[in-house]
């Protein structure tokens, strides 16, 4: 018999939590969807190399899925700056910025990022996923009766943020300015609109037709939200991304 978690007084019927979770895990295994996390040792060595142990043997692994495109996590200047920051500031603020304030280095970083993208201000999040999710969820929810236009191949973080906003959403074909133009043309002119897309798509390597998409959004009075996650640092004269590379920083509203 399957053991049952005791969640109520003795003798009282209660939900079989163990059974539910056990059946759910078994279903994942049957569908080959149960995720196993590979343990990797990432040492300070020329990338993209890591190490794992298979059948008791330590083996080198080539990591092709890293976002550390320029190897900055191993760069000696970055490592020295990290050591200096740890020695001076410690390992954390001890609380959120709302409660404990914001460290001077974060303020400086946000100013530098704003300048890099040609914007009046910037805000640092804990990850790119959190940034997309939070900004899109908040922005689309706060704009009254906002209508969101989302590229069909947008990252899951963007899709989740838009979903959480509960704003009406229309998905346009991937990187198709003409289709976006047609969809915006039938939207109410005075209604707040947000067009969200990526500049460089991480899943397939596509580069969006930035100039055309931004022109369509502006022509219809829509705000533009451009995810430059995989282009920053790699493209542009100063690493500002594809918007900088194509001279379009001023055309994009939110980066």
Protein language model regions, located:
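Conserved N-terminal alpha-helix of the aminotransferase class I/II PLP-enzyme fold
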Residues: 79-127
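Conserved active-site segment immediately N-terminal to the catalytic lysine
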Residues: 221, 240-255
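N-terminal "arm"/small-domain region of PLP-dependent enzymes with the aminotransferase-like
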Residues: 13-89, 222, 254
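Conserved PLP-anchoring active-site segment centered on the Schiff-base-forming lysine
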Residues: 135-156
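Substrate-binding/gating loop at the entrance of the active-site cleft, primarily
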Residues: 127, 149-165
């Amino acid at each position: 018999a399957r053991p049952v978690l005791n969640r109520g007084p003795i003798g009282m019927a209660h939900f079989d939590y163990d059974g539910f979770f056990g059946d759910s895990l078994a279903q994942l295994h049957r569908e080959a969807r149960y995720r196993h996390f590979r343990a990797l040792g990432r040492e300070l060595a020329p990338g993209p190399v890591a190490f794992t142990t298979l059948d008791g043997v330590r083996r080198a692994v080539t990591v092709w899925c890293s976002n550390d495109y320029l190897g900055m996590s191993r760069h000696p200047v970055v490592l020295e700056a990290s050591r200096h920051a740890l020695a001076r500031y410690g390992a954390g603020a001890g609380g959120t910025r709302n409660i404990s304030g914001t460290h001077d280095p974060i303020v400086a970083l946000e100013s530098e990022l704003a300048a890099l993208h040609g914007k009046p201000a910037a805000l640092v999040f804990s990850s790119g996923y959190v940034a997309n999710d939070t900004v899109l969820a908040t922005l689309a929810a706060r704009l009254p009766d906002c209508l969101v236009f989302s590229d069909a191949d947008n990252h899951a973080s963007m899709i989740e943020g838009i979903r959480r906003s509960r704003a009406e959403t229309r998905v346009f074909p991937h990187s198709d300015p003409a289709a976006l133009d047609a969809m915006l043309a039938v939207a109410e002119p005075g209604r707040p609109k947000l067009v969200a897309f990526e500049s460089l798509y991480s899943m397939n390597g596509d580069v969006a037709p930035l100039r055309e998409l931004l022109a369509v959004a502006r022509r219809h009075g829509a705000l533009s939200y451009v995810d430059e996650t995989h282009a920053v640092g790699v493209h542009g004269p100063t690493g500002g991304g594809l918007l900088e590379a194509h001279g379009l920083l001023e055309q994009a509203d939110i980066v």
